[in-house]
Structure formats: C-alpha cells, structure tokens
C-alpha cells in the first residue's frame, strides 16, 4: 500500500493543501512551517479507523490537562470552527494486496486504488471524528455485465464525492465500489475486509526520547538511560529474535557505520546488550545516534512490505556523514522491501544524498488571500513546493557555493550580487557592521553571485518558489544597470530591495596599497618562474603602476571609471600565450575574462581579513536592507 495524495482543509496552519507522495517523500522546511501537521493528518485518518463505527466522539469536558485544552480551538485554521476539518487520502495498492476485496466486489483484477475521506467537527462540547466516504477501485472489462452496471451506477457518485473522473486503462474501466457514503456503511462485509486490510499499515516511528525516571541517586548524571522510546526498544528486541531480520539490520548498519557492534543473546530480550571490543555493554551505554539508527531500521525491517512509515527527524544526534549514509540506506530499504517512507527532516545533508529527489517537498508559510468569516483578508498558511522538479538552478547554485542541495530551504534572505568577489567583500563589510545591525543577524541570509546565470530565473526561484526575501546589489556599470531593470521588472523596488553601488566594481573600494599587495602575492603564486618574464612587458608594467596609484578602478575627471583589473587581465592572457601557451592551459585560463574572474575572487579572499572600514554608500545599502527586514 502507498499513499498517492492527501488533501487537507482547515486544519491547524493549513487552509487548503494537496500533497503528492512518492515511495520516499521528504518534508523539509523551517520550524513551525506545517511539516508535522501533514504527518498528523495521515495518523488522524488511519489510526482512528476500526470496524465498529464510522464515528468517534471526544467530550472536551473530560480533558483535564490545560495544555490539551489550549490546543482544541487551534485544531482549526485560525480557530475557524464553523467549517469542518476535511481530510482525504488516495491510496494505491500493491499487486496481490487486495485479493479478498477483489473477490467480494466481483472485480476481474486486483483492487488498484482507494479513496478515504474524514471530517472533524466541533459541536458544543464534542469533537467528532467521522469517516465520511470510502471508495475502492478496480479494473474490469467494459464488455462485462459487472462493468456496465458498476459504471452506470457509480460514475455519478464517484465524481460527486471525489471530484475526479474515472480513469481508463487499455480499454478497461476503473470501476468504483462505494463502501461508505456520507458516513453510512453501504456494505458491512466489504467494509470490515477493507479496514482489516489497511489497519496497522501506518507506522509512526517516534525518534524522540522518553523521559525516564531514575531512582533517587545522590550523584547526578552518573548513570545512562536509553535515548529512544520504550516502543523502539521493544521493536529492536523483536527484530533481533529473527535471524533473517537480524542479518538485514547488520547489513544496513555496516553501510552506515562501516562496522557493527553485534547484539548478544538475541533470544534473551529482557536486557539489550551489545559486544564492544570484547566487553558486554548495555544498549543504553552506546551513543544516542547508534540507538536511534538501530530503532529506525528495526522498525522498518520488522514490519516489511505493504507498510507506510512516518519518521520525524531521523537525523537526530547523528554526525553529518551518518546522516548522508542513513538517507541512502533508507532509500534502498524502501525499494528493496517495497515500503513507503514519509520523512520530516531539518537536514540538507539528508536530502542531498537521495538519488530520487522528485518527492522532496519544501514546506513553508505564505500569505494567502481568502474570504474569512464574511470578509476578505490575508492570513499566513502552510504551502508546499517541489524544489527539485523543473529548474535545476538551486542545485547548481549549491554546488558553486559549496553547500548541499536543500540549503536554500532554510534561508530567509537572499542578497544577490554580481560575482564571488562581491560576495566575499560584502560579507566582510556586514561583519564590520554587525553591532549596528538589528535585524539581518537574526535571519538566515545568504549572499549569492548571479553572474553567468539568468537573473530573472534566480529572482523567480528564490522569491516565488522558496518564498525568500530577495535583495539585489548591482555594480555601477552598463551590465549592473541592465540587472537593476530586470529586478524592478520582477517586482523588486529600487532603494528598498534593489541598490547600486557608486563604483563599477566592489574591489574599487579597496585601498590601492592593499590591492596591489594582494595582486602581487597572487601573481607570484600563479606564475611562479614565469613571473619576472611576464611582468617585463611594458604595457603590463604601465597598468600595474596605475593600480599602485588608483587600485582596481581609476577615476578620471570627465570620463567613465576605468576598470584597471579588467584591462590587466586581458593583457596578461595575451602575454602568457606568447610566453608559454601550455602553461596557461595548466592554469585553466582560457581568456582574459576567466583570468579576471579568478583574480577578483582570490584577491577578495586575501583582502577580506584586512578590511577595517565600510564605504559610506555600501554602509547605507546594508543598513537599508537591515531596516527593510525590521
């Protein structure tokens, strides 16, 4: 069994949301964005199903815990209790999983899909969970009597209840069989078989530790207690009793850790012990990461195929290397055991390792316009997007910045600058102003170079897809002015989110003595024994003499600012080709432009630690960004 789709209305921070699921689905985003609410919806639907009734009532007057009382109204979107919470799920069944249903429904092939709809309503002091609709679907021949009768009677009900048209497949029809309609069980026998088929198929893996009460010991912190729940410990105990499951567990652990501390006497499960370098140690004496990995893997292995696992933050207590290996092992287990994993994570490392990222889902809160209790308004609501579908921009950006894919899902602010030298120097200036900044340090911000990419696409991806606040700082040259226009056309406001520095390049602010020192160090490192020969060129010497006086850029009265580093880079390429063409290939320089990009970045890296003051115009830009975030 696999969940294909879940639809949620009016639940917690969710107004109206449809989520598609794959074999391995990963929900990733900031705290309080609604990830766990999506998991809870699945639990609310499935963990309350039973054969006795389609309705469950909770008398809120019986709740004594104040924290639970406080939660009641907040179950509804902005406490909007006049409208019921509506939850629905589409299921796909594995081959052979619904044989009993096929027989009792008279289908010619196995049951393929199911639709379940649940509502939660508030009525005086009652919270009512109600199973509204259950429909199953299977393929039969169009020419068969069953198909004709079913199609005639059920198409109207199907489209009315689900809003979906009946599908076709190679001449066959997907025929619905209504089990529950508007809270009424239509066929008790089929209903019982259906509930027996899907109950206990949803497994919530609790990775969070229980609070264990220790006996009254005068020396605090002396003894260890388990870092996982008693439920996970029992799962481990049951798993290691079975030899095949135990071997599978060990194989997975080797993939993650490289070695295995074996369980001792798996048939003696009162106390879990492991062998460690010839010693017998209790389970709780091993690291918390080891305990969590064992518990997660044992949960999946013990249940096996046809199950769906809901796992929150499997990366808890794990080293980044273990996180990446765990992600790969979980993905392999999902495929090998034919199970579905729905995972909540805060780890970009986890998603970076997945082979199939189509169902990595970014979860965030956005402002939405709705008609709320009779008047139009804007409210924050949980929204989702699929960052690894379509454009691969974020992945290539992550590689260039040396961060893992998914990094941007945790960013609040993106400051777009032209190149890497701008990124490095701007960060240095922000660090110098840190005591004056009230807002920017509170945000997860990232400075991103946009040269060599479509600025329009970058702004769209970060602003619309990721929901990140975007700023642009452009150079004061022809290209910079073009980029300012693009940003303004994309809805960014000049002097609020779009800024232009006074110079043609950020390196133009560097003192000439600091700039020439860094440039000379870099040229000596790169050119080695070719240094003296190259710098004998008269034109190169002339440009360097100007750099000693003016720095990277030269201002001439009545003329445009002259970019001296750009001029030097072009001449260096020409001279180096004449001196030693093979040598220039080894440096990876294929043009004057490539030399310029390299020199800019490396000079910025050398200079940033020597910065002592911030130019006035850049200081004003940074303070304006800080104010805009207030």
Swiss-Prot record:
InterPro entries: AAA_GajA/Old/RecF-like, Bact_Antivir_Def_Nuclease, P-loop_NTPase, TOPRIM_dom, TOPRIM_OLD. It comes from the Archaea. It holds the Pfam family OLD-like_TOPRIM. Residues 412-507 form the Toprim domain. Keywords: Plasmid. This is Uncharacterized protein MJECL35. It comes from Methanocaldococcus jannaschii (strain ATCC 43067 / DSM 2661 / JAL-1 / JCM 10045 / NBRC 100440) (Methanococcus jannaschii).
